[in-house]
A protein has these predicted regions:
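Extracytoplasmic entry segments of secretory-pathway proteins
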Residues: 1-129
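Extracellular/periplasmic metallocenter environments
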Residues: 11, 20-29, 109-126, 130-210
Length: 210
């Protein structure tokens, strides 16, 4: 009888050990995290692509068109963090819809900017919006919910000044995502929305996620 009880007790102990091992190895063990690859993209926005500071295109068929440089076709990895730097050299045009003066879809819900105040003094800080009347351009990817207004260079800033805007956003799965500027900045076109606003390589582009 004693031997039978001993075997029973030993069996119970073994079962308890197996249950604890199962819980420890499977139930409480979290799967690993797959981190996306950070990617940095550096762009320049200019009033005329033929006279840019960083990536001028003097032989461009439309040298007086506004544009993003050096290109508007951007290739990035899927499910990753994209770090953006945009060197904004153009003056203000203004947004027709003040709602788009706000930042959307970025990491932290803001952007960091170095710029010049009304006295021409350099300033720096994190922002969640700008005065919509002072926007020069925007960087917007509607299908990703990303929208960043780009402040125009203050008229009192030193000649050749640049506002530097940095922010980050996350990509989704593979695909081609259209991006564009929403400021009607195309001079000499109908309502400012023709020409470069509708043309790849200027104020419209593709984000190729793969």
């Amino acid at each position: 009888m004693v031997r039978r009880l001993s075997f029973t007790a030993a069996g119970v102990v073994i079962v308890i050990i197996l249950v604890i091992a199962f819980v420890g190895l499977f139930m409480l063990r979290r799967p690993g995290t797959l981190e996306g690859t950070p990617t940095t993209i550096h762009l320049e926005t200019v009033a005329a692509v033929g006279a840019a500071n960083e990536w001028p295109r003097p032989d461009d068929p439309h040298p007086d068109w506004v544009g993003y440089l050096p290109t508007t076709i951007l290739r990035v990895p899927a499910n990753s963090t994209i770090n953006m730097q945009i060197d904004q050299e153009d003056g203000a045009t203004g947004l027709r819809n003040p709602f788009w003066g706000k930042v959307f879809g970025t990491e932290g819900g803001n952007m960091h900017m170095t710029y010049f105040d009304d006295k021409g003094n350099p300033q720096e800080g994190d922002m969640t919006s700008i005065d919509p009347t002072q926007a020069a351009h925007t960087f917007a990817i509607p299908d990703l919910g990303v929208f960043v207004p780009l402040l125009g260079v203050n008229s009192n800033a030193p000649a050749g000044s640049t506002n530097v805007i940095t922010f980050s956003f996350k990509t989704k799965g593979p695909g081609i995502y259209h991006w564009q500027c929403f400021v009607p900045c195309a001079a000499k076109t109908v309502f400012g929305n023709g020409g470069p606003m509708q043309t790849l390589g200027y104020m419209a582009g593709e984000l190729i996620v793969s």
